[in-house]
A protein has these predicted regions:
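N-terminal hydrophobic targeting/anchoring segments and the immediately downstream early-domain regions
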Residues: 2-158, 183-185, 189, 202-304
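Loop-centered beta-sheet repeat module
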Residues: 156-197
Length: 304
């Protein structure tokens, strides 16, 4: 028996498994905001163009996180249709002169393609209401030239017919600067989501924000160097209209960009999905639905 015990093989010692490495510390809100915006560039609803349209002034100063811009085509009232046509012509020529920076986009597919190519997508519009000359034919001409939004600021019989024509041909209805009653009346007619490219939610009562939410409209809010104040405005839009209605107009502090605002919203509990919507997905969805309605619309053209 002693011999059997002596012949027993020695016990095998198992190798020590190294401890799992400590997970990296979570990113703070600023780092998370920066990473999100790097992957999801902002679509800005309102880009002011220099009055001279000198090539040296373009492309317009923008935040580093901007991936697409709607270029305002507003002109002085006395310039009317002719002034707007000249502006469209000049803008198209200047975008063509900046191929490394800009690319005109006429559809949401072209918008996405421009961004994927590292260019800022430039969308023409909105055109000012006074530049229509009270004519549906002018609407159609602007659309043929690439304009994709018109700013409706009052509501009368022509406005009702114009909204229907805009739905038919695929022009977004921009309600920036319209009083609450005009917004209500326009929303009762349009079948496509409205845009407010220079939204002032503080000027709109809760019931109007609710109607905008039902419409799927996008309120594009100006970003300033006070992210907490802007976040307060966006929190109200989120609460009354829904997170699907929040968007960005432009920033008055392009050097700071959008990271401070998005970091503040993360601290307030906004989800990554909601912030992607704010950055660009909500605006893209509204434009895409406007395009789709135009393709499926069977409304007869409005009288000129």
């Amino acid at each position: 028996m002693a011999e059997l015990l002596d012949d027993h093989p020695p016990t095998t010692t198992l190798p020590t498994v190294p401890a799992a490495p400590e997970p990296p510390p979570p990113l703070d809100e600023t780092a998370r905001a920066r990473a999100l915006l790097a992957a999801q560039p902002v679509t800005e609803g309102h880009t002011e163009l220099p009055g001279s349209l000198d090539p040296e002034d373009l492309p317009p100063v923008r935040a580093a996180e901007a991936g697409a811009q709607l270029w305002s085509l507003h002109v002085e009232t006395d310039e009317g249709v002719i002034g707007t046509l000249r502006r469209i012509d000049s803008v198209r020529a200047l975008v063509a002169a900046c191929p490394e920076d800009l690319r005109l986009a006429y559809t949401t597919s072209e918008l996405a393609h421009a961004r994927n190519c590292g260019r800022v997508a430039a969308l023409l519009g909105p055109v000012g209401w006074t530049a229509l000359g009270g004519s549906a034919a002018t609407l159609r001409a602007y659309h043929a030239l690439g304009v994709r939004a018109v700013n409706l600021t009052r509501f009368d019989r022509f406005a009702r017919d114009a909204v229907r024509e805009m739905n038919r041909i695929g022009l977004a209805v921009d309600l920036s600067g319209a009083d609450p009653d005009t917004v209500r009346r326009a929303l009762a007619v349009t079948r496509a989501p409205a845009l407010l490219t220079r939204a002032d939610p503080e000027a709109l009562p809760d019931d109007v924000l609710g109607l905008l939410g039902e419409n799927g409209a996008v309120l594009m809010v100006t970003v300033t160097d006070d992210p907490a104040a802007v976040a307060d405005v966006l929190d109200r839009v989120r609460a009354q209209a829904g997170p699907h209605c929040a968007g960005v107009s432009h920033t008055t502090a392009p050097d700071a960009g959008y990271v401070p605002l998005f970091a503040e919203l993360l601290r307030r509990g906004w989800t990554a999905q909601e912030l992607v919507g704010l950055a660009h997905a909500n605006a893209t969805r509204a434009l895409r639905e406007t395009e789709f309605l135009s393709r499926t619309n069977r409304i007869r053209p409005a009288a000129a």
